[in-house]
């Protein structure tokens, strides 16, 4: 068995970047719902010398997540987990976004929390949208959604009343992720493990390209021109932060969210009254 296994759930731009940054010397398990994307990422990493295994996973299915976790455990002691699977409001419906980003993330946190090794770490990739698209939703509502079983949350009348379209579904699900991580940090700590989240802003990935093309290009351009860093980020910059959170240097950091947004939240929260 391999001494240390790195699990990447979501093999897209950010997921693969983290796998490459953290994966050397580890057994890497890649998972994604898209077989084509999964195969391409696996082949690229194998060509570059990584030890990679892949398996299809649909995180909106609890059974699929359980099977994926069993596969991870068969490869060796799971020490690092990255949950980067998620759907964009541009290409997905309200229902599918909630099933993946909200319930699916909950399934992953719960199942890998049962087998993570002592000293292990997890990073959930959330989004700046959790701060900007759900700011009007009462925190008590967010807490209730986060603390309802992933198997039951999609049927809550409160969810239907709160989330009216795919954009609010995206923002609410990402804000719920913060509370899911905070709550999980307590149970993970009992196993000697840590869990945190990262909220990227505008990062140059295929998902951002889709959002730019779907009548949101002016928003992305505005952010790139006006945020303090004056540009969009790249997936490697998110991977560097993930490496910190997954490593021993962050041993006193758990249950928190780190923004990697080039200062976008500061820009969006600025005082415009003067």
From Swiss-Prot:
EC number of this enzyme: 1.-.-.-
Pathways involved: Mycotoxin biosynthesis
Enzyme class, spelled out: oxidoreductase
Gene3D superfamilies, alphabetized: NAD(P)-binding Rossmann-like Domain
Originating gene: bsc3
Keywords associated with the record: NADP, Oxidoreductase
Family, per entry: Belongs to the short-chain dehydrogenases/reductases (SDR) family.
Active-site annotation: 170, 174
Residues that, per the record, bind NADP(+): 14, 170, 174, 203, 205
Example GO molecular function: oxidoreductase activity
PANTHER family: DEHYDROGENASES, SHORT CHAIN (PTHR24321), ESTRADIOL 17-BETA-DEHYDROGENASE 8-RELATED (PTHR24321:SF8)
The protein, known as: Short-chain dehydrogenase/reductase bsc3
InterPro entries: NAD(P)-bd_dom_sf, SDR_fam
Organism: Alternaria brassicicola
Keyword check for Cell membrane: no
Reported function: Short-chain dehydrogenase/reductase; part of the gene cluster that mediates the biosynthesis of the diterpene glucoside brassicicene C. In the first step of the brassicicene C biosynthesis, the bifunctional diterpene synthase bsc8 that possesses both prenyl transferase and terpene cyclase activity, converts isopentenyl diphosphate and dimethylallyl diphosphate into geranylgeranyl diphosphate (GGDP) that is further converted into fusicocca-2,10(14)-diene, the first precursor for brassicicene C.
């Amino acid at each position: 068995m391999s001494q240390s296994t790195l699990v990447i759930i979501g093999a897209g731009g950010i997921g693969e970047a983290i796998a490459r940054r953290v994966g050397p010397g580890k057994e890497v398990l890649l998972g994604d719902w898209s077989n084509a994307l999964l195969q391409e990422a696996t082949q690229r990493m194998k060509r570059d010398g990584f030890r990679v295994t892949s398996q299809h996973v649909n995180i909106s299915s609890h059974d699929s997540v359980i099977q994926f976790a069993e596969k991870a455990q068969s490869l060796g002691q799971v020490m690092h987990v990255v949950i980067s699977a998620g759907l964009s409001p541009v290409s997905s419906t309200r229902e599918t976004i909630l099933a993946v980003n909200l319930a699916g993330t909950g399934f992953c946190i719960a199942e890998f929390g049962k087998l993570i090794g002592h000293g292990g770490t997890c990073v959930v990739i959330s989004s700046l949208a959790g701060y900007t698209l759900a700011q009007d939703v009462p925190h008590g509502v967010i807490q209730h959604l986060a603390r309802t079983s992933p198997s039951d949350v999609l049927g809550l009348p409160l969810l239907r009343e709160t989330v009216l379209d795919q954009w609010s579904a995206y923002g609410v699900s990402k804000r719920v992720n913060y509370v899911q991580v905070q709550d999980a940090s307590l149970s993970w700590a009992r196993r000697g493990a840590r869990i945190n989240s990262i909220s990227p802003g505008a990062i140059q990935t295929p998902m951002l390209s889709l959002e730019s093309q779907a009548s949101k290009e002016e928003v992305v351009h505005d952010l790139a021109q006006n945020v303090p860093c004056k540009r969009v980020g790249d997936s490697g910059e998110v991977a560097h932060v993930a490496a910190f959170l997954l490593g021993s240097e962050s041993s006193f950091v758990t249950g928190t969210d780190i923004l990697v947004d080039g200062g976008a939240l500061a820009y969006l929260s600025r005082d415009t009254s003067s």
